[in-house]
From Swiss-Prot:
It comes from Homo sapiens (Human). A divalent metal cation 2 binds at residue 253. GO terms for cellular component: cytosol. This is High affinity 3',5'-cyclic-AMP phosphodiesterase 7A. One of its GO terms (molecular function) is metal ion binding. One of its GO terms (biological process) is cAMP catabolic process. SUPFAM superfamilies: HD-domain/PDEase-like (SSF109604). A divalent metal cation 1 binds at residues 216, 252-253, 362. PANTHER family: CYCLIC NUCLEOTIDE PHOSPHODIESTERASE. It holds the Pfam family PDEase_I. Hydrolyzes the second messenger cAMP, which is a key regulator of many important physiological processes. May have a role in muscle signal transduction. Its EC number is 3.1.4.53. InterPro entries: HD/PDEase_dom, PDEase, PDEase_catalytic_dom, PDEase_catalytic_dom_sf, PDEase_CS.
Amino acid sequence: MEVCYQLPVLPLDRPVPQHVLSRRGAISFSSSSALFGCPNPRQLSQRRGAISYDSSDQTALYIRMLGDVRVRSRAGFESERRGSHPYIDFRIFHSQSEIEVSVSARNIRRLLSFQRYLRSSRFFRGTAVSNSLNILDDDYNGQAKCMLEKVGNWNFDIFLFDRLTNGNSLVSLTFHLFSLHGLIEYFHLDMMKLRRFLVMIQEDYHSQNPYHNAVHAADVTQAMHCYLKEPKLANSVTPWDILLSLIAAATHDLDHPGVNQPFLIKTNHYLATLYKNTSVLENHHWRSAVGLLRESGLFSHLPLESRQQMETQIGALILATDISRQNEYLSLFRSHLDRGDLCLEDTRHRHLVLQMALKCADICNPCRTWELSKQWSEKVTEEFFHQGDIEKKYHLGVSPLCDRHTESIANIQIGFMTYLVEPLFTEWARFSNTRLSQTMLGHVGLNKASWKGLQREQSSSEDTDAAFELNSQLLPQENRLS
């Protein structure tokens, strides 16, 4: 197959503002057909740092146009990559002359999804694929394949798997689950498009985020798979349910900026304005997922009504992960359990259970073994503290749990388990009283006890240091000098 690497010069088929034209890596407006499916391979064009939509897709075009809102108000600021890295117009707080714009010493250049796919995919090298699993052969070794045989094990080590796959855990694991659940055959999916879709998802996670990155997405997807295997769900879910659940799990934190919703609101971030300060991040994750679904053309062979239904239901799943709405979903779930009227043959009830399953998967870190849970705790705390450092630097007021000088990992985790994790997983165990549910609750108890032990040690150490300092101050000057 011959590929033209030169960008075609096409006339603009709509008025485009000058600030968009001047933006490097902005939207590619094209009159040609979709990227895949062009009758002439020379019509393929490289993505220029953003999503390239067909000119007729007004909704998708609008979604990506939103990314240019920042350009109008931040002249002179150079973005490191596209996406939702939070931008604050600090001229509100300081004059332009007082701002010091620091440039990262590490120049991170995002390899565009099609570009990376073009270089690495076996399909573009003309290699025939006779089995759906053969697509995995070039990407990870026998150890990773061996791990995938135990992908339904709750002790699955996603950190080890990510190392074995050279940082491609989300692509490798999700593709395997699509094959394992028979989704490729059932929905007649083009493996090339599926592969490209998963690569784009993985790339749109920010690897520099300590916690909200592609590894977290892979971990949540693996947990979701475990829940789908539970008897009550396994006997009732349809292939459609499984498809939506896996896509929602893989994309539930897509393009996460590494800061929380209150940060975006108090800095007047354009996403907060767009979504009216309501489930800001979750709405953005959902809309980003919709953009990639449309760009990849993975389900272009399905009827329009089915595609629209898919987008809506994926949105409902992702929006359920908004931690600020935990009590709302938990109360509804608990009331159904109290009445005993959950009927999994009812699509609405089944969808509620899938929402609760994704919520559990999203915050299941304390339910893992101590070795895994501790790593996740350290990573999420690092991300919290990084946000707190930014807030201190620009005098924004440090958000709760984000001050590294007053908070500790132990305190944060104990509170998280007590007020969020235990109530959620207790109700999940009422719904699905299985060995896995009891194992998860058991891990929560053990991990909480471990953090309390570390908390006591830290408190004892601080008391000892304080006493030593006090004694040193009380000693006569000559004794201290001697």
